[in-house]
Amino acid sequence: MKSLKIIPVFTIVIAMTLSAAAQKDKSKRPSPPVQVSKSVNGTTVTIDYSQPSKRGREIFGGLEKYGKVWRTGANETSWIQVSKDVKVEGKKLPAGKYGLFTIPEKEEWTIIFNKKWDGWGAYEYSKEDDVLRVTVPSNSTDEIVERFTIDIADSGEVSMAWDQTQVSFSLK
């Protein structure tokens, strides 16, 4: 009789263990993680982010409100790491790892490099932790980009595209 009572408890423990293991497999998320890395003039630049999908939604000005700090992807805070000091749009960014946040606007975006890189989304974002902010133009595209994508060109141009919006900043 005692063994019959143990079976449901054992089943629950196994189910919880399997569920926890599945959650650790980030590749199965609706917004899977991506990491891009490139050597730019002898500096290794790595960007880690998750790729949300458009899925028929209006993205900028809709899902992601204009004028609000955005995590620049999905899930955990997106981050960028540079192995040496670089210039971002002509402004110095010391070597290190930074949270990559943005403030989308219709005509221009603010790109933010923040001390807080290890968190969930932009919930723990604080302007006081900003290391550098640059403003760049926002461009409309004819083509719809379904998944948010960040690319690093050999020249050091970092490009972000989603829906019908594309934004770039230079890293030298």
Predicted segment positions?
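Residue-level signal for beta-strand positions within conserved beta-sheet cores that form or flank
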Residues: 18, 107, 130
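Primarily secretory-pathway and cell-envelope proteins
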Residues: 23-68, 119-172
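Mid-length scaffold segments of soluble, non-membrane domains
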Residues: 71-119
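Bacterial Sec-dependent N-terminal signal peptides
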Residues: 1-25
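Short, surface-exposed loop and linker segments with low hydrophobicity and enrichment for Pro/Ser/Thr
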Residues: 5, 94-96, 102-105, 148-154
